[in-house]
Amino acid sequence: MPQRQPQPAHPVDGIYFGLMSGTSMDGVDGVAVRFEAGRAPVVLAEAFVGFAQSLRDALFALQQPGDNEIDRESLAANALVARYAVCCHELQRTAGLSRDEIRAIGVHGQTVRHRPERGYTRQLNNPALLAELTQVDVIADFRSRDVAAGGHGAPLAPAFHATVFGAPGETRVVCNLGGISNITILPGADGDVRGFDCGPANALIDAWATRHLGKPYDDGGKFAARGTVQASLLGALLDEPYFTAPPPKSTGRDLFNPAWLDARLAAFPQVAPEDVQATLTALTAVSVAREIAQHAPGCKAVFVCGGGARNPVLLDALRHALREAGVPATVDTTAALGVPPQQVEALAFAWLAYRFTARQPGNLATVTGAAGNRVLGALYPR
């Protein structure tokens, strides 16, 4: 007689996978995590699966309008999902899980357009194919529901940050330094959690390193460390109206891309490449620090996640910029709170899948500007 499998204490408790490929477009981060109501999430495995240069080129090309987009987009989505499936299989192998033990996969997809002011955001994905390749339920398309409610569809991580990183009596900021920088302000007392995109981070830093070093990123910030911040160039970059726009706001490669940078560099032909890199690093730090100074002046601690957490030159620049802005905050990575920085974004999308399964809201309207909190995502059954 077959034995009944033990049921979770809460009907949606269990093991979820989270997959995130961000605006740096270098690969996909994945986590396998156990969620139980009233308990901290437990990470069972993590994995990173890189993208081949051919896939990266296809993704970068889709950032800008071009010919035959529908065909190119569909083929790129299938190639992308093939890498997602590899990541899922690696998580399953590392954690020693059968597919029946996995409640669902929460997958963000790859943003190729983000234009909430026009009523849409587009994440490249083929969740039906991922469900077929993994034989696990897939939950995807998290951002569009928030946009449909009048929100920016971003950032979505603040609700997760509040659950995991908040501390009573202490104002904290969680700063994600991915392709784009964003912050979550955790008030530590009565008050709304807030969050928004600050501006470019690795999107421009990596692009400049690729152009001048032939490498996908500035390893440890060494290229920037060879240069000197050019105050006049930094001022010209900071003249971009986005930096002074009030929240809620979100941005991406639609605005902050190499063409945006080149248009401003045209007035500074004498600036050496390493000085441009130093200035781009300062741009990231200053744009974040100014937003913290304006919206969380009492912040005592900033915790960094994302790829920028591995760049000590950028972290030092952020510390300097915060001091200059009059913010007496320490800067550390989320590892100090028990979550390695490379796991945070993927964890957030596993959590969003968990919330969807419980039919609980995943956004914060105070962050995105939506008409209200909404259940985010769509289910693709295995």
UniProtKB/Swiss-Prot annotation:
Amino-acid positions noted as binding ATP in the UniProt annotation, renumbered to this chain: G22, T23, S24, M25, D26, G27, V28, D29
Single Gene Ontology BP annotation: amino sugar metabolic process
Entries under Pfam families matching the protein: AnmK
Keywords of this entry: ATP-binding, Carbohydrate metabolism, Kinase, Nucleotide-binding, Transferase
Pathways involved: Amino-sugar metabolism; 1,6-anhydro-N-acetylmuramate degradation; Cell wall biogenesis; peptidoglycan recycling
GO MF annotations, alphabetized: ATP binding; kinase activity; phosphotransferase activity, alcohol group as acceptor
InterPro entries for the chain: Anhydro_N_Ac-Mur_kinase (IPR005338), ATPase_NBD (IPR043129)
Enzyme class: transferase
EC number: 2.7.1.170
Catalysed transformations (reactions): 1,6-anhydro-N-acetyl-beta-muramate + ATP + H2O = N-acetyl-D-muramate 6-phosphate + ADP + H(+)
Family the entry assigns: Belongs to the anhydro-N-acetylmuramic acid kinase family.
UniProt function note: Catalyzes the specific phosphorylation of 1,6-anhydro-N-acetylmuramic acid (anhMurNAc) with the simultaneous cleavage of the 1,6-anhydro ring, generating MurNAc-6-P. Is required for the utilization of anhMurNAc either imported from the medium or derived from its own cell wall murein, and thus plays a role in cell wall recycling.
Protein name: Anhydro-N-acetylmuramic acid kinase
Biological source species: Burkholderia cenocepacia (strain HI2424)
